[in-house]
């Protein structure tokens, strides 16, 4: 078919975005970049995917009612952010809006993955300093509340991704 896939990642390109460059965190000053491919053998040139004006990592993008929602980590060290924020776009490749206010609480969070079930969003993430998983929920992507206390996760779990599988696939995984 005509399916085109987008592969995106965070990296630092030395000398780019000097206004947010610091020596802490190994001098990392990440932005989100992407390539496209139809066959996973040939790839487009690398393009800038998201430049929020701060060090950004761990983006995950999901479709929502005709728009694209990016959950991302603000990796700013000084003053510390280390939280999850949201940006939106009409097209997958952007341009994305400025990142909103943090949706996570007074702890360091990264590696978000999002679900929308029965009209409610849940964003799961790694509370990596606390060595545990966390979650927040929202009906509108604006007002968020903590639901971390409801989680029961395997010990040692780190960044994860939620995706849909069939009952048959589940049975094969369990057995």
Predicted features by range, described:
Residues 1-175:
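Carbohydrate-active catalytic/glycan-binding domains of CAZyme proteins
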